[in-house]
């Protein structure tokens, strides 16, 4: 028997797939519906952390450039998911990975890892805290 609030591996994979799909379509309402109110987004390489659904949605909506997210591999095993994706920004492409924590059918934490260190783009200081 599955404890209350737990999801199946298929449900976690579906949630992670929907995350990538709604980002790519820029469907901010649907994207926000996948996130917990108190979602935490972390970028270890830039030492940035964003807390809360509204800030995380805005962070993505305001992200500069012509960017695209193409899933390569989606894994899920409650309460965790993983997305290997091709990130394309202004014509340049790279692989990256995101790890997800899921609780009660919503994403509560996202950690993005990139192949190279980088400095965050300017103009998002109002949304992030630096570690």
Describe these PLM feature segments.
Residues 22, 41-42, 88:
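Alpha-helix C-capping/helix-to-loop hinge sites
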Residues 2-7, 57-131:
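A beta-strand edge to alpha-helix "cap/lid" segment located at domain peripheries
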């Amino acid at each position: 028997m599955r404890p209350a609030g737990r999801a199946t591996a298929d449900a976690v994979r579906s949630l992670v797939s929907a995350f990538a799909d709604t980002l790519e379509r820029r469907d901010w309402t649907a994207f926000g519906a996948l996130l917990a109110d108190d979602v935490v987004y972390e970028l270890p390489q830039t030492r940035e952390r964003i807390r809360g659904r509204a800030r995380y949605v805005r962070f993505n909506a305001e992200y500069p450039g012509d960017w695209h997210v193409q899933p390569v591999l989606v894994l899920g095993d409650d309460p965790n998911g993983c997305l290997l994706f091709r990130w394309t920004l202004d014509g340049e492409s790279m692989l990256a990975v995101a790890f997800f924590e899921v609780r009660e059918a919503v994403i509560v934490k996202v950690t993005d890892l990139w192949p190279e260190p980088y400095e965050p783009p300017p103009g998002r200081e109002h949304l992030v805290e630096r570690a």
